[in-house]
Amino acid sequence: LYLIVDNTFLSPYFQNPLKFGADIVIHSGTKFLGGHNDTLAGFIVTNNEEVQEKLRFIIKTTGAGLAPFDCWLILRGIKTLGIRMERSQENAIKIANWMKKQPVVKHVYYPGLQEHPGYEIMKKQARGFGAMLTFDVDTEAHALQILESVRMIKFAESLGGVETLI
């Protein structure tokens, strides 16, 4: 039985689960690592040689390795990963604190808020809180009003690029 951690939201910049006992860590290269919404990639990381050899065999025999251009796109994104993660986190903290003051917002879920139940754990095992937050509003009508009113925020199915998404 292996402990597998999806580290997509924090990236290796903010958290390294192998240091805390994870056997396998998964990163979506499509998200923060790539950072430009222009490639499709994923990574599996382990420090277990037996698992590594099994994964290497699967990758080689199924042709699941990345093309050179996709590798270049990910490497290009990693060059700016630090500044993008820091700025995204700064913005998330500001937005979370602003949302807490809005009368229609009933709850803000963001581990960077001191009242979040995972705040202390995050401080111990990560170097940051990331940029992902969510919130509840009081009525469906207010939720629809928010969705229809946003101008700078894009509707999208992916994350980690330069756009703010809802």
Per-region residue spans from a language model:
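Conserved PLP-enzyme active-site core in the AAT-like
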Residues: L1-V104, Y109
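Conserved C-terminal alpha-helix-loop-beta "cap" of PLP-dependent enzymes
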Residues: H107-I166
